[in-house]
Structures are given as structure tokens and as C-alpha cells.
């Protein structure tokens, strides 16, 4: 059994190659401490979703751009897009002219540490789902010093199997595992170990530093071994020398602490990964979708050797997908794949240094280039033949199915007689079929084929009528597969040339877009990314598939699509100083959303009728009588704890694993806190009736900050909702209804949807905090999207950053910092700038709003000013746009709540008996805490948190019910009969899980 080291908060993937009918025999034994184990499978064809070559970048910046774009498309990090949005906002604000436009098209790449950090922050379950893993068997938690073994029958040939050894839940403890997995061949019952004994390695004490920089080929050419510098997991740790082994037979790259340590620390299947490299800095980045390795060679010769070897893994996968050939001929790598120089006549197990291998793949690269140069698109008749053959296959299969129902086996005597007369000819026929099929087996495996079975020599084989039909069908299928390969290659070349015209546009993708994976841009060869806009334009001009007029039209469509994508994915597109560019993006997005998407291809009358129906169907807002609300809340039963004393009591402990006392909370959840955004919703209704709506929308965007005007509010934090916890808010007096739900636990993500007769607003938010010693920076990462139903005008903005100051000592308070913008699809925008506070001046409350009309408008620029704790007014007309509402009586003793906030946890007559069991108002800990029963609230809080942990550990976590994920950072409200308000109308909570 091999030994595997698993770092804390990490995991290890062990891959197994097998075929249909095989049995995987495995043994797992954790040493001392337990480990979580699951068996997954992943489609072999998913290699087409990755780059099929090592991507060579001309410099490190381009390399990081490419890797960042690859992460964006794969979903390797849910925070990357937001990082890009913020980075792009900064770059837009500091550039103008042509430089500004060029930056708008390009990626703002992450640093090497940022790429690793973002990848590590994603929960393992999300990584598995995003990378295409399917759970086969959950082994569960294996206790320390306990041997678990079992067998798993393989029922398909289209998958790699993977053992996931999960230590991500352990915050500090590293684990050591004894592991073995062997494949028992289904045909001859022979056992094939998935890992041979590690090949002999040089003795570390006898080697100089120069020798350590050399590469070695061992195990009869099966392995390439040598040292590389590997970027460590944590920030600022730099690179560390590690010993790497590339197994050509399985296409896996593993690494160890050094050359005399047999404990594996990680493994990646190259053909299922994206590999990018930069020769100038000798960097290689491997992204498997599960983890990111950043490697660095010590010399350019070593870098080239590793790149060529990694490229060979891709070529083996693409050129010969029948893995059985490789399994039966392990020495094929020495004969056919010149990964490194030929070995000397000495024993193959002797270690021989390698040289550079530029010529190893040059033939393939030149061949591919020549094919691209002479490429002629297939005629339309080929595609017609392809469709016709599909129908013929369907008909023949149907006929064989009918014949098999009436088929009766013949006697042994009849079989023998029949064989004597037919064996000779059938052998030739079958052998021809084998040759034909093996030549075109890209989409099928030998175990699936009748032709893959050898012709028996004992003459007990007979070709009856049904068999002959199936044999003929197989020959036909083999031709079909061959034709499919040609068409597929034709399609790839077309896609590649079309994709090159939109290199800089496919980075921002909205939920309504159909797109190719980013990796298809480097399809089947090594390509240097164009660095400039001119290079991209040259590619468009050189494309032979489009005429001049078609080319212009195509470019316009791509640009239009790109504008929609940029606008819908983040507010980044609107934070540029180029007002025309910003306005064009929003207009195009608005235009496309109304006419371009398939779901919106309706007539004008149909759209209006739908809107009318939606407006009249705002259930629960037409309550027959006025609802009386309490506008107050009981006084707090306990004072908030001192954070300084809490830290003193927990010196040296991991604060993330320590539960804060319930007295550190206020009696509302985060869902209810964010719902306070709509306290001043009448501003939106007023905006729909005014010629200058952006003025009132800007006031609404700022009004949320006013909940912190009483400094008592900053002494406590809201309760953290459980996964799938909900909160509804019906304000019939203001004419809107709201539903919110916690849709993700790690990272915490909350989705909101509010609607009124005149407007609707959606918001997906991920709260984040940064601790700065005596203060905390708070960010609500997400875009508020507002739409006016009558005019179709769209508004977007992000909530401003706030700072919680004097965290340890002094009077604690909250204040907004920096600036933010509100953008309209009609070209208007507002710029909100908060006053900066002096070192000894206390809280800063002043701010200014600049209303900037589009250049084509005759309206003049307006300025608004005010205090976010009081009001906002127009400096020219002195019209009061907004002013704060009332606080509860004696707010110092009542958590600093406003009257609006005090009503959030009340169950009024409009909610009584109608709420789902997941609503925050029904949480027993919040209810007990509001009523002053602190001990009971503490008990319930711990109990609910423990129940949620148990559900998660058992793999039985609840799923969101009312929102669906449409992109990495956006969840969309579900409409139709399964929508929240339809369920509430019918009181249909039948499939809702009990959270408490």
C-alpha cells in the first residue's frame, strides 16, 4: 500500500483507469486520525472541455490572463468574477481614451497567489460538481487505524474513476493514509495494480545540486522524474523544491517531498486538466478544476522537457483513445513517443538524464499547421449524408430489436454444421471488421463491439441471421463513426477560426448566453495569445470563412453579444469614465434582453399581456384591510459582550471554530437585515413617475446606510441563517412584496427578489469581511438590478463599502467609504462620493451625488448633497429627495432599531398561518432572544447549528427551493407553479425540509 499525505483543509484525488466488466479492489487505512472518503467518476470525453495542448504564453502577464480566464469559465472560484469586477473598476477609473477601451476588452488577471487562493476557497462539493464528477459510492468517514476494503464493479467504459480523500473539514490536523486500488480484469481475472512499485530513484546524498536539476527516465521509459519548484498553498510562502513524477501510461503527474520520500502528496490527470506555460519565467500552471499547481523549472531546458512531456499526455489522449493498446504495450512510449532522448543500450532501469525534446512534437505541430493552411470546408452534402445515416442506424437497430424477440438458439449439432461451412469466410469478414472498427473507435470502446472479440478457434461459433445483421450494422456504424470524426474535425476548425475573432469578448458571460468553452480557443495545437487589439483584428481579416460583408455583420453580432455579456455579468462595464461606452453597453443589453433571447421572442401585444397578467397577479398585496404593525420591540435583556474580553478568553484558539455567545446578536437574521434595503421602497415608486428617475433611484441606493445612524446598532450582529432558510416581507401599505433565501452556506450567498406593480428588483449578495486590527471592512458583494415595468428602463449598482471602527475600544460606529455609481440603461448615471473623515473628527456623514445625463441629452448636470444619517436634497432647487424615518422609542435599549426593522420579526395577520416552516420569524432561537429568554436562545442556537453540521456531514444538506443558480454569482427567482408565491397561495409546503 502506498502512503499519502493530506494537508489540513485539503484533499487528494487518486485516479483509476478501468473498463467495463472490471472490478476495482481498494483498501484504505487512515493512520491515527479519520478521513472522509468518496468514490466518484468523471467522463473521459470531458477532456474535450479542456485545452488539448499545453498553452504557451509569451510572458507571465499573458499566462496569468489565460489562467484567470480559464478559472472564470470553469467555475473554479465563486469569488473570481467579483475580484475581476473590482479590479476592472479600478483600472477603468485610472485610464481613458484608447487605453481605456483596450482594458475594457481584456482580463484583469489575478496574481499567482490570487489564483491559488481563489481556487482553495471553493468548497469541495462545489468543485466536484463544477468539474463534472458523479458520486458512485460514499465510503463515508473512515476512523483512524481502521482498514476499509471493498470491491466496485465497473459498468461502463466512458469514465475515469477517482477516490476523493477529503480532509477539508480539518482546520489544523494533517492526515496520513495507506491506500491501494487494483483493477481485476473482467476477461481473464488478472489483477492490475493502478500504481506499480515506485521506480528506483537516485540517492539524494550522492547527488550534487547540478544533478538534482536534471531529469531522469526510469521504469523502461514509463516515468519522467525530476525536481520542480512548486508554489506553496498559502500566501507569501513562495516556491519550494519538490520531486515530480510523470507517468506516461496513465497520464498522471504526482509529486513528493523529495526523491527519497515515498509518500505521495498529490496527483493530477493531465488530460483532464488545463496546462499553460511561459518560457520566459519558466512557469507551468496546471489547473485540474479541483486544484491549481503553479510550477517553476530551474532551467529553460528542463522547462522545455516538462512542457513536451505534458504535451505528449494530451497527444496520447487525442490520437489514441483506445486505452487498451497502451495497457497491453507499456513500452510503446519508448518506441513511438519521443518524450526524451532514446535510452542507452544499458538496462532500462538504469537512470539516464534527458535532453530537450523540441523535435518530439514538431512533426505534429507542422502537420496541424499544414492542415489548417489547406483546409477546405466540407460541402453541405456531407452534413446531409450525416443526418441520413443517423436515420438509417435508427431503423436498423429497430429491426434488429424486433428480430431478437423471435430468435431461438439452434442446437449444438446445427451450430457445428453451420460453422464448418461458414468459418473461413466469416473469419476474413470479421477480421476486416476489426481493422475497420479499430481505425475509427474514437467514440466507442472495444468492450462494446462484437468485432472486439476474437474469432474462436474451437469452431463452436456460428453466424446466424441476427448475428449477421448486427455484424453488418457494426460495419455501418464504424463508417458512421469515421464520418463523425471528419465532421467533428471540420466543426472544430470552424469554431476555432470563429472563436479567434472574439478572444477578448468571451470573458464575461451572462446566464442567457450560449458559448464555447474558453479552452477551445487553443483547440488542437500550441497557440500564442494575441497581445494587442491589432492582432485580434488581423485574425478576423484573415479568416477565409467569411466574406467582407458577412465578416462585418459577424463582428457586429459578436460585439453586440459581448456588450450584453459584460453588462449582465457585473457592474464593471459601467464604471468606466467613457460615458459613451458605458451607455452603449447598457442599451445593447436592454435591447437584447427584450428581443434577442428565445424566451422573449414574442409580439408586442403578447409582451404587454404578459406584463398585465404579472401586474395583476401580485398575490398577497391586495389584502382587504389595513394591517396594524407594532412599530416597537422589547428592550434587550442582556448587554452585548465585550469583544476584547472575548478575545482574551480565547487566546491561541481558532476563532472561526468558536461560537460567539447569543448576546452578541440582534433579534433578526441576515435575511431580515438585508431586507431593510427596501425600507424606503416608495422612492422607487416615485421614480417611475418622474422624468428624472435616476435621482430617486440614487437616493434609494443610499438610504440603506441610515439603519446605522444610531451607533447602538453596530454593537451586535444579526443571526446567520441556516441553508435554505427564507424570509418573506409583504408591505401592502408600500405596495411591494419580497422573498429572500439563503442559497449557499460556504461561501454564504443570499438571494432576494422584490416586486411592485411598477418595478421589480433582484439581488444576489455575498457578505464579506476583512479584519484590519481595530476595524472591519464590510462588503456586500453583488449587483442590485432594478427594472421599471412600464418603460423597461434598467438600473444597476453595488452597495458601498462600509467600515466598522473602534472594534476593540472606544465608541463603535459604522461609516461608508470611497464611492460608488448607479447606472441606467438610458445612459444616465450618478456618482456618489462620501466625505472623508479626519483622524480625530469622528464619524463622517456627508456625501454628494452628481447626476450625469447622457451626452445626447439637453439636461444639465445636477448635484445633490446631504447626510446619510438625515436627508438628501437638490443643491439647486433645494427639493428634499429623501429623509430618514423614525427610530423606535428609547433605541439605545432596543438594539438601535428603526420602526421598520422592529416590524420585520413580527407575525402579523397577513403572515399568520401562511408562512413556510423555513421563515426566519419561526426560528426558535431568534424568537426566544427577542422575548428576553437568553438561556433558551443560546440552547436553541447551538442545537440548530449542530443539526446543520450533521446534515452536511451525512451529505443530506437541504437545497434552495425558490431560487436557481444562473451564473457563478447570480441566482434567479423561480417563476411558475413552483414559485414561492404560488406555493404560498396554495399553502403547499409539502416537500419543505424541517430546519428546526
Curated annotation (Swiss-Prot):
Lipid transport protein (LTP) involved in non-vesicular transfer of lipids between membranes. Functions in phosphoinositide-coupled directional transport of various lipids by carrying the lipid molecule in a hydrophobic pocket and transferring it between membranes through the cytosol. Involved in maintenance of intracellular sterol distribution and homeostasis. May serve as a sensor of PI4P levels at PM-ER membrane contact site, regulating PI4P phosphatase SAC1 activity. May be involved in ergosterol transport from the plasma membrane (PM) to the ER, however it does not bind sterols directly. Belongs to the OSBP family. Interacts with SCS2. This is Oxysterol-binding protein homolog 3. Residues 75-114, 338-372, 556-611 are annotated as: Disordered. Its main location: cytoplasm. The modification Phosphoserine is found at residues 190, 193, 324, 605. The keyword Transport applies. Residues 558-577 have a biased composition (Polar residues). Residues 221-315 form the PH domain. GO terms for cellular component: cortical endoplasmic reticulum; cytoplasm; cytosol; endoplasmic reticulum membrane; perinuclear endoplasmic reticulum; plasma membrane. A motif (FFAT) lies at residues 514-520. PANTHER family: OXYSTEROL-BINDING PROTEIN HOMOLOG 3, OXYSTEROL-BINDING PROTEIN-RELATED. Present with 589 molecules/cell in log phase SD medium. Transmembrane segments: none annotated. Pfam families: Oxysterol_BP, PH_8. SMART domains: PH (SM00233). It comes from the Eukaryota. The modification Phosphothreonine is found at residues 210, 323, 325, 352.
Amino acid at each position: 500500500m502506498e502512503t499519502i499525505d493530506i494537508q489540513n483543509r485539503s484533499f487528494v484525488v487518486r485516479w483509476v483507469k478501468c473498463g467495463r466488466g472490471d472490478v476495482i479492489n481498494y483498501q484504505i487505512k487512515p493512520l491515527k486520525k479519520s478521513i472522509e472518503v468518496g468514490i466518484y467518476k468523471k467522463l473521459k470525453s470531458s477532456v474535450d472541455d479542456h485545452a488539448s495542448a499545453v498553452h504557451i504564453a509569451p510572458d507571465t502577464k499573458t499566462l496569468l490572463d489565460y489562467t484567470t480566464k480559464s478559472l472564470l469559465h470553469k467555475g473554479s472560484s465563486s469569488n473570481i468574477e467579483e475580484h475581476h469586477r473590482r479590479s476592472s473598476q479600478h483600472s477603468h477609473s485610472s485610464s481613458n481614451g484608447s487605453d481605456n477601451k483596450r482594458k475594457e476588452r481584456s482580463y484583469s488577471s489575478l496574481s499567482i497567489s490570487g489564483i491559488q487562493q481563489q481556487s482553495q476557497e471553493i468548497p469541495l462539493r462545489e468543485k466536484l460538481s463544477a468539474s463534472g464528477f458523479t458520486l458512485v459510492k460514499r465510503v463515508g468517514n473512515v476512523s483512524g487505524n481502521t482498514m476499509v476494503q471493498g470491491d466496485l464493479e465497473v459498468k461502463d467504459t466512458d469514465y475515469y474513476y477517482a477516490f476523493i480523500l477529503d480532509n477539508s473539514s480539518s482546520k489544523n490536523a494533517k492526515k496520513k493514509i495507506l491506500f491501494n486500488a487494483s483493477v481485476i480484469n473482467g476477461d481473464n481475472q488478472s489483477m492490475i495494480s493502478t500504481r506499480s512499485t515506485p521506480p528506483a530513484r537516485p540517492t539524494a546524498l550522492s547527488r550534487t545540486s547540478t544533478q538534482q536539476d536534471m531529469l531522469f527516465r526510469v521504469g523502461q521509459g514509463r516515468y519522467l522524474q525530476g525536481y520542480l519548484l512548486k508554489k506553496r498553498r498559502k500566501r507569501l510562502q513562495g516556491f519550494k523544491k519538490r520531486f515530480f513524477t510523470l507517468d506516461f501510461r496513465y497520464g498522471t503527474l504526482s509529486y513528493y517531498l523529495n526523491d527519497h520520500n515515498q509518500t505521495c502528496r498529490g496527483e493530477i490527470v493531465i488530460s483532464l486538466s488545463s496546462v499553460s506555460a511561459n518560457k520566459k519565467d519558466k512557469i507551468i500552471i496546471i489547473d485540474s478544476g479541483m486544484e491549481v499547481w503553479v510550477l517553476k523549472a530551474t532551467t529553460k531546458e528542463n522547462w522545455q522537457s516538462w512542457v513536451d512531456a505534458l504535451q505528449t499526455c494530451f497527444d496520447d489522449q487525442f490520437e489514441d483513445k483506445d486505452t487498451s493498446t497502451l495497457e497491453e504495450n507499456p513500452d510503446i512510449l519508448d518506441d513511438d513517443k519521443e518524450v526524451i532522448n532514446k535510452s542507452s543500450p544499458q538496462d532500462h532501469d538504469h537512470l539516464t538524464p534527458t535532453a530537450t525534446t523540441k523535435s518530439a512534437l514538431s512533426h505534429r505541430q507542422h502537420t496541424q499547421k499544414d492542415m489548417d493552411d489547406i483546409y477546405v470546408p466540407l460541402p453541405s452534402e456531407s452534413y446531409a449524408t450525416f443526418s441520413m445515416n443517423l436515420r438509417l442506424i435508427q431503423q436498423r437497430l429497430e429491426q434488429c430489436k424486433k428480430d431478437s424477440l423471435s430468435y431461438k438458439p439452434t442446437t449444438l449439432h446445427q451450430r457445428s454444421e453451420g460453422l464448418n461451412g461458414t468459418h473461413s469466410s466469416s473469419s476474413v469478414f470479421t477480421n476486416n471488421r476489426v481493422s475497420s472498427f479499430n481505425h475509427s473507435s474514437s467514440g466507442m470502446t472495444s468492450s462494446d463491439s462484437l468485432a472486439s472479440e476474437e474469432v474462436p478457434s474451437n469452431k463452436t461459433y456460428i453466424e446466424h441471421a441476427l448475428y449477421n445483421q448486427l455484424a453488418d450494422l457494426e460495419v455501418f456504424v464504424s463508417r458512421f463513426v469515421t464520418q463523425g470524426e471528419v465532421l467533428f474535425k471540420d466543426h472544430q476548425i470552424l469554431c476555432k477560426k470563429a472563436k479567434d475573432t472574439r478572444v477578448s469578448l468571451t470573458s464575461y458571460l451572462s446566464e442567457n448566453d450560449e458559448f464555447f468553452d474558453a479552452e477551445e480557443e487553443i483547440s488542437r495545437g500550441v497557440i500564442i495569445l494575441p497581445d494587442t487589439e491589432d492582432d485580434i483584428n488581423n485574425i478576423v481579416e484573415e479568416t477565409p470563412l467569411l466574406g467582407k460583408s458577412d465578416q462585418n455583420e459577424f463582428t457586429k453580432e459578436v460585439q453586440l453579444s459581448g456588450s450584453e455579456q459584460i453588462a449582465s455579468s457585473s457592474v464593471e462595464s459601467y464604471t468606466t469614465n467613457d460615458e459613451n461606452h458605458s451607455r452603449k453597453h447598457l442599451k445593447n443589453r436592454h435591447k437584447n434582453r427584450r428581443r434577442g433571447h428565445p424566451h422573449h421572442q414574442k409580439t408586442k401585444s403578447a409582451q404587454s399581456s404578459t406584463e398585465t397578467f404579472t401586474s395583476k397577479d401580485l398575490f398577497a398585496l391586495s389584502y382587504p384591510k389595513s394591517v396594524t404593525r407594532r412599530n416597537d420591540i422589547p428592550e434587550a435583556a442582556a448587554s452585548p459582550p465585550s469583544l476584547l474580553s472575548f478575545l482574551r478568553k480565547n487566546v491561541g484558539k481558532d476563532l472561526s471554530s468558536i461560537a460567539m455567545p447569543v448576546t452578541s446578536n440582534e433579534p433578526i437574521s441576515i435575511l431580515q437585515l438585508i431586507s431593510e434595503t427596501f425600507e424606503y421602497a416608495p422612492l422607487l415608486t416615485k421614480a417611475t413617475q418622474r422624468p428624472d428617475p435616476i435621482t430617486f433611484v440614487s437616493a434609494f441606493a443610499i438610504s440603506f446606510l441610515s439603519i446605522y445612524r444610531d451607533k447602538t446598532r453596530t454593537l451586535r450582529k444579526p443571526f446567520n441563517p441556516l441553508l435554505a432558510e427564507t424570509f418573506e416581507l409583504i408591505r401592502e401599505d408600500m405596495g411591494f412584496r419580497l422573498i429572500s433565501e439563503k442559497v449557499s452556506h460556504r461561501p454564504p450567498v443570499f438571494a432576494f427578489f422584490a416586486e411592485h406593480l411598477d418595478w421589480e428588483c433582484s439581488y444576489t449578495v455575498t457578505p464579506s469581511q476583512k479584519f484590519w486590527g481595530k476595524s472591519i471592512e464590510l462588503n456586500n458583494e453583488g449587483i442590485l438590478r432594478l427594472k421599471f415595468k412600464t418603460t423597461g428602463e434598467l438600473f444597476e449598482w453595488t452597495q458601498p463599502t462600509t467600515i466598522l471602527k473602534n472594534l476593540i475600544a472606544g465608541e463603535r460606529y459604522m461609516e461608508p467609504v470611497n464611492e460608488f455609481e448607479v447606472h441606467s440603461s438610458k445612459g444616465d448615471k450618478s456618482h456618489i462620493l462620501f466625505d472623508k473623515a479626519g483622524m480625530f473628527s469622528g464619524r463622517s456623514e456627508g456625501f454628494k451625488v452628481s447626476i450625469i445625463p447622457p451626452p445626447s441629452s439637453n439636461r444639465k448636470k445636477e448635484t445633490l448633497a446631504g447626510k446619510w444619517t438625515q436627508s438628501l436634497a437638490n443643491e439647486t432647487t433645494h427639493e428634499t429627495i429623501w429623509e430618514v424615518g423614525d427610530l423606535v422609542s428609547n433605541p439605545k435599549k432596543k438594539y438601535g432599531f428603526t420602526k421598520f426593522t422592529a416590524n420585520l420579526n413580527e407575525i402579523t395577520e397577513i403572515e399568520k398561518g401562511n408562512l413556510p416552516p423555513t421563515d426566519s420569524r419561526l426560528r426558535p432561537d431568534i424568537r426566544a432572544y427577542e422575548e428576553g429568554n437568553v438561556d433558551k436562545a443560546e440552547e436553541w442556537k447551538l442545537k440548530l447549528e449542530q443539526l446543520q453540521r450533521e446534515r452536511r456531514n451525512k451529505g443530506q444538506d437541504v437545497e434552495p427551493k425558490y431560487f436557481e443558480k444562473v451564473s457563478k454569482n447570480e441566482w434567479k427567482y423561480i417563476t411558475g407553479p413552483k414559485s414561492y408565491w404560488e406555493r404560498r397561495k396554495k399553502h403547499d409546503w409539502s416537500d419543505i425540509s424541517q430546519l428546526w
